[in-house]
UniProtKB/Swiss-Prot annotation:
It is found in: Membrane. It comes from Mycosarcoma maydis (Corn smut fungus). This is Pheromone receptor 2. GO terms for cellular component: membrane. GO terms for biological process: response to pheromone. Pfam families: STE3 (PF02076). Receptor for the A1 pheromone, a prenylated mating factor.
């Protein structure tokens, strides 16, 4: 557990998973599926951050860049919440389409929905960043083989500031999921016509792929969050939050944690959670990275890459086969040039 080879494998897999999670981003960019694009953003950011941490701190506690570690800790504590909020954006849009509220939407309505999506998918995770300092007792944890993380003061305020936000967003997602199913049951015979009448660009198959993706992401993140809450309560329980000054005493200290000093049960929990964090990227790729539309995009990119490489090779070949006139002049050589004149008769 947490061996050098495992860390390298996990780090490389995180980087690959982060990349494949964005494989269909062009399709959703054209369709303006902001919720899915935000999912890809958070998934890519979180997994690349995990991969870099696993590789940089592999059997090491050397901290080369403290500010970068601060940024890494912020990403680590917000990216999964960002996934939950992005799933909520997707379900909000699907419920609006199914309820036919978007049938006569104006330009202002579309702009307002765009602002709401960015406010939920980016604003809520960003809002939690300054609030987290209330329950952050010191600056950083640097854990061998894992990397940078922000410490959490396990207390009643921590439940409301950190844990319950995720559970609350998951609950709202569940409500929207029930509403989507309700509208589908009411209009299942005219559902395809309802989708086309709103110019949503969604077929019934794509609509339910989006629905399944949002539910899957919400369930995966919520399951991980429940596991974290249960583990934190079992290990240390809730500490009394007496005052700001006492909780934040010597705030600038950085705690370096060798992996040998961590209990086996805690190591097992950390190992389960970090491998489980790869599942959102797998869900994104399975639902939208293997479709016919995505495959056509891959083929177009591959052809463009081949054409680019062949054009560069042709330019280099043309340059090698061109006449060196300076060499002819230096040797006093003579050569003739045949110029063909074409006559055009109108």
């Amino acid at each position: 557990m947490f061996s050098g080879k495992e860390n390298v494998s996990f780090g490389v897999l995180c980087l690959l998973a982060g990349c494949i999670s964005t494989s269909s981003c062009l399709i959703h960019l054209q369709a303006k599926n902001i919720g899915v694009l935000l999912m890809m953003f958070w998934c890519f950011t979180g997994l690349v951050n995990k991969g870099i941490n696993a590789l940089a701190f592999n059997n090491s506690l050397r901290l080369a860049w403290t500010l970068g570690c601060d940024l890494s800790a912020i990403i680590e504590r917000t990216w999964q919440f960002g996934l939950c909020c992005s799933a909520l954006c997707v379900l909000q849009r699907l419920e609006g389409i199914a309820s036919l509220r978007q049938a006569h939407s104006t330009v202002w309505d579309r702009k307002r929905r765009l602002l709401i999506d960015f406010g939920v998918g980016l604003g809520l995770p960003a809002l939690q960043i300054p609030m987290f300092f209330i329950v952050q007792p010191y600056r950083l944890n640097v854990i061998e083989n894992i990397g940078c993380s922000a410490p959490l003061y396990a207390s009643v305020p921590a439940l409301f500031i950190y844990h319950l936000w995720r559970l609350l967003v998951s609950l709202v997602c569940a409500v929207y999921a029930v509403l989507v199913l309700r509208w589908f049951m009411l209009r299942r015979r005219q559902f395809t016509a309802a989708l086309s009448s709103q110019h949503s660009g969604l077929s019934q198959k794509k609509y339910f792929r989006l629905f399944a993706l949002a539910i899957c992401e919400r369930v995966l993140v919520s399951a991980g969050q429940f596991y974290v809450i249960i583990q934190s309560l079992q290990i240390g329980g809730l500490l009394p939050y007496t005052s700001w000054a006492e909780v934040h005493t010597n705030f600038n200290r950085i705690l370096f944690v060798p992996v040998d000093t961590i209990a086996h049960s805690s190591l097992l929990s950390l190992s389960i959670l970090r491998w489980f964090s790869l599942t959102p990227a797998m869900a994104l790729f399975v639902f939208f990275g293997l479709t016919e539309e995505a495959q056509s995009v891959y083929k177009a990119r591959w052809k463009a890459l081949i054409n680019l490489c062949s054009s560069k090779g042709k330019k280099q070949t043309d340059g090698r086969e061109s006449l060196d006139l300076e060499a002819f002049e230096s040797h006093g050589s003579k050569f003739s040039v045949l110029v063909q004149r074409d006559t055009v008769i109108c």
